[in-house]
């Protein structure tokens, strides 16, 4: 049964243009062609990247965060077995009846119980240091892979002449630079998938899962069908905007608000140029229109462009939130990240600390969230 499925899955009619056979893509005369087995190494490399990330966050990102004044927030409370048991088994916001009953059991005031539960909830939420570490790691990878991509592509004719993307397709040998560009990029996305359970949970969690899996699927498919030339162009224009996003988030967590806003505006410009001009009018034109001058439409051609259009749909999704943030910046005084992490704003944390020292709950209500024109309150995150 497995052999039957394997034969069906790798049928040439699904992957290659008519008249082309897998035997045409066998290595010969020192030329190496893509093989699906090349991608197996991306899984162990993904775990290796996770190890590198651990040491990077510990020995590079954390000292950098400390130098920028970002410290690990400590939320300390007195141990209380009754309240701890209630907290672990409660799935919703405690009602007034719950608070009243707990106060009686623990011989505490209702206000003390509410404050204990609120602080205990904060202990389970990521602090600014953890968010900075994540952004610093992503910024470093995107910066290095974009620089590598620029080096790999600058002397390639298909980077300047899109017709060269399809010249002699699919009999295009694999270059060492293309191999490492793909392997590192795919390994990174696998590492993001594997770390989803431990990374900071965000409101657009599902969109991130779809994005990561779509990226891996697109890269895997383009590799197996030998769409390497167009694939490297897609990866490069996607990585280049993420550098600015992650750097803006880093400065947001550090409290460098003017720098953060400047970087966010640069990110916005780069994002819309790369995702709404270059991608649809250059990349999609290259993959959707130009091949028809060489080949008749076939399955992998259709499937490739279907995946690229799904990717463009995600661009529209994230572009909507970016425009929404800019709209708040221009027309309102209170700017929040509409797709930020599921946690309170940093200003709210400061106000709660003031409440605990002064013992006045009304102080928190009066202060509110402030009117800071800060574009990325808790770090806009999206690809």
Curated annotation (Swiss-Prot):
Tissue expression remark: Predominantly expressed in testis. In skin, present in the upper stratum spinosum and stratum granulosum (at protein level).
Biased composition (Basic and acidic residues): 355-364
Entry annotated with the keyword Kinase: no
GO biological process terms on file: ceramide biosynthetic process; cornification; epidermis development; sphingolipid biosynthetic process
TM segment ranges: 32-52, 139-159, 174-194, 205-225, 263-283, 302-322
EC number per UniProt: 2.3.1.24, 2.3.1.298, 2.3.1.297
Listed Acidic residues bias regions: 342-354
UniProt cross-references to InterPro entries, sorted A to Z: HD (IPR001356), Homeodomain-like_sf (IPR009057), Lag1/Lac1-like (IPR016439), TLC-dom (IPR006634)
GO molecular function, one term: sphingosine N-acyltransferase activity
Domain of life: Eukaryota
Cellular component GO terms, alphabetical: endoplasmic reticulum; endoplasmic reticulum membrane
Keywords for this protein: Endoplasmic reticulum, Lipid biosynthesis, Lipid metabolism, Membrane, Phosphoprotein, Transferase, Transmembrane, Transmembrane helix
Region called Homeobox-like, residue ranges: 66-127
UniProt keyword annotation of Transcription regulation present: no
Pathway where it operates: Lipid metabolism; sphingolipid metabolism
Sequence positions bearing Phosphoserine: 340
Known role: Ceramide synthase that catalyzes the transfer of the acyl chain from acyl-CoA to a sphingoid base, with high selectivity toward very- and ultra-long-chain fatty acyl-CoA (chain length greater than C22). N-acylates sphinganine and sphingosine bases to form dihydroceramides and ceramides in de novo synthesis and salvage pathways, respectively. It is crucial for the synthesis of ultra-long-chain ceramides in the epidermis, to maintain epidermal lipid homeostasis and terminal differentiation.
The protein, known as: Ceramide synthase 3
Taxonomic source organism: Mus musculus (Mouse)
């Amino acid at each position: 049964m497995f052999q039957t499925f394997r034969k069906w899955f790798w049928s040439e009619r699904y992957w290659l243009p008519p008249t082309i056979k897998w035997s045409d893509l066998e290595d010969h005369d020192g030329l190496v062609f893509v093989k699906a087995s090349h991608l197996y190494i991306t899984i162990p490399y993904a775990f290796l990247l996770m190890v590198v990330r651990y040491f990077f966050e510990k020995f590079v990102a954390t000292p950098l965060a400390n130098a920028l004044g970002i410290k690990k927030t400590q939320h300390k409370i007195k141990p209380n077995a009754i309240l701890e048991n209630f907290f672990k088994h409660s799935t919703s916001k405690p009602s007034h009846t719950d608070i009243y009953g707990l106060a009686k059991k623990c011989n505490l005031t209702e206000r003390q119980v509410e404050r204990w539960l609120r602080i205990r909830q904060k202990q389970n939420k990521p602090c600014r240091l953890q968010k900075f570490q994540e952004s610093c790691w992503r910024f470093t990878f995107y910066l290095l892979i974009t620089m590598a991509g620029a080096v790999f592509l600058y002397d390639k004719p298909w980077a300047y002449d899109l017709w060269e993307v399809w010249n002699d397709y699919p009999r295009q040998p694999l270059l060492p630079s293309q191999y490492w560009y793909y392997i590192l990029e795919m390994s990174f996305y696998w590492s993001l998938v594997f770390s989803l359970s431990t990374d900071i949970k965000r409101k657009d969690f599902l969109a991130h899962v779809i994005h990561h899996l779509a990226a891996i699927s697109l890269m895997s498919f383009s590799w197996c069908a030998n769409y390497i030339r167009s694939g490297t162009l897609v990866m490069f224009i996607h990585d280049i905007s993420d550098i600015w996003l992650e750097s803006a988030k880093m400065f947001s967590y550090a409290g460098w608000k003017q720098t953060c806003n400047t970087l966010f505006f640069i990110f916005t410009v780069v994002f819309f140029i790369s995702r709404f001009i270059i991608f649809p009018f250059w990349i999609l034109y290259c993959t959707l229109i130009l091949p028809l001058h060489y080949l008749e439409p076939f399955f992998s051609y259709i499937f490739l462009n279907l995946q690229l259009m799904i990717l463009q749909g995600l661009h529209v999704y994230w572009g909507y939130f970016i425009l929404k943030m800019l709209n708040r910046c221009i027309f309102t005084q209170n700017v929040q990240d509409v797709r930020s992490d599921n946690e309170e704003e940093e200003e709210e944390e400061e106000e709660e600390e003031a409440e605990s020292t002064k013992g006045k709950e009304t102080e928190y209500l009066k202060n509110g969230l402030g009117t800071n024109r800060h574009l990325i309150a808790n770090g806009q995150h999206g690809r």
